[in-house]
Amino acid sequence: MARAMMKMPEDFLMKVSRLENKTDEILPRVLESGAEVVESKVRTNLSAVVGANTKDESRSTGELERALGTSQARQDKDGNWNIKVGFDESRSDGDSNAKIANILEYGRHGQAPKPFLKPAKSQSRKSCIETMKAKLESEVEGI
């Protein structure tokens, strides 16, 4: 059998070993920086579609836009870190904001869809990744 041995650069190994102890502190900050980019794009797209191109005058109260937010970064049972950009559930009229957002995104009988989430996801993907990479690099350099 052939045998191969690879050695990693020493400075890289030192960074990884220092990072090991602080990943629980660093990863939430990295995810939050990426979520800010996505949230701003979703907010921009949502503002553009709410009340636009309607037959009747818009009845928008602004509750959906105010309910948009980002959850805290949390670690699931498998050890993966997650953060969510979405809507709070409570509304003054009893409906959920997720339902209203779904109706806006996909439409319903007599109401054409006005997608804002899916375009925001695809438009902000690269900038989100770049922002998170830059934040991770700055956090690793700060160790």
Where do the PLM segments sit?
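Short, Lys/Arg-rich flexible segments
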Residues: 1-84, 88-93, 98-143
